[in-house]
Design a protein with these regions (language model features):
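Short loop/turn segments at secondary-structure transitions that flank enzyme active sites
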Residues: 43-48, 110, 120, 124, ...
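Flexible glycine/proline-enriched surface loops and loop-helix/loop-strand junctions
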Residues: 75, 98-99, 138, 264-272
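Generic recognition of flexible, low-complexity loop/linker segments
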Residues: 27-30, 92-94, 130, 216-217, ...
Length: 289
């Protein structure tokens, strides 16, 4: 995997907590390496093959060009016609990993882009600037919501330059309120009847400061009825923290990029977790280990 010009909350907190981990990417996942593991943690990923939809603002930067070169080289080496096909294969491998009993935890754009990649398996939502061929006309009608874990009835963005995959994300709603008022609230569960959600929501506070991301949180109108919402902001109509089962395994989606950096921009320095030893937002990541 290429080093990206932003921090990764998952590897930051695993490193800070001295929890050993291996790093895998497309080649290893397609090569069935996931079978060697029980837990898979993801962060700011794009499973649709649109390179995070950074084209408008960053396509001229060296890191973006390298990401495209590396991804196209990997796709070619693995026998795929284009990057989006490789990313779909990766998404399906992860789904099989969960079905077989694995645990998936993913943050930021690794949530909605993952669901969308699975739902768009039978169509082409990537425009020319991403995969060198046009989108399929009327691709929205071919979105199969049943294939994804968490979301349904959403509309896919048709603008290749928009920094958004669909209308699942609630980021725009957060732009209208002051940072100090941006919160989400954890649900309380019975340790007797809801053991896993109870563990995932353990914290010293139920009120947690919000934080932005490419995917900040999820509009509840698009969340499937069988998905467990563990943290939300009812006033905004958004959920931040989701959990569900699939096959023999489970998955958790956590919106936002960095729990201790309200707006983490490209090229910002990584967060120093030694300054935030009791971070409730980072605690939720550690609960998923």
């Amino acid at each position: 995997k290429s080093i990206q010009p932003w921090d990764d909350a998952v590897t930051l907190v695993l490193t800070y907590a001295e929890i050993p981990f291996d790093m895998l990417y497309d080649r290893e996942v397609v090569g069935d390496k996931l079978a060697q593991y029980d837990w898979l943690h993801l962060h700011h990923e794009d499973f649709t093959g649109q390179y995070g939809k950074f084209y408008k603002n960053y396509s001229g930067e060296a890191w973006y060009k390298k990401q495209v070169r590396d991804s196209e080289a990997s796709a070619k080496m693995l026998g795929f016609s284009k990057v989006s096909a490789m990313k779909l294969s990766v998404a399906i491998k992860i789904k099989e990993f969960v079905a077989g009993g694995g645990f998936l935890f993913t943050m930021c754009s690794g949530t909605d882009s993952y669901d969308l990649a699975l739902a768009a398996y039978n169509t082409d939502i990537c425009d020319v600037i991403y995969d060198h061929d046009p989108v399929e006309p009327n691709f929205q009608s071919k979105i199969d919501y049943d294939q994804g874990f968490a979301f349904y009835n959403y509309t896919v963005s048709k603008d290749p330059l928009e920094y958004e995959y669909s209308n699942i994300d609630g980021t725009d709603q957060h732009k209208s309120i002051p940072e100090e008022q941006d919160k989400f609230f954890l649900f309380e569960f019975s340790a007797k009847w809801d053991i896993v959600p109870t563990m995932l929501c353990q914290n010293h506070t139920k009120e947690i400061d919000g934080f932005m991301g490419q995917t900040t949180d999820f509009r509840t109108e698009f969340i499937k009825s069988n998905v467990l919402i563990m943290g939300d902001n009812k006033a905004m109509g958004t959920a931040r923290y989701l959990h569900g089962e699939f096959g023999e395994g489970t998955w958790t989606y956590y919106g936002g990029h960095d729990p201790e950096d309200y707006r983490h921009y490209v090229h910002d320095l990584p967060t120093d977790l030694s300054l935030h030893p009791n971070s409730p937002g980072y605690r939720l990541i550690l609960n998923n280990i």
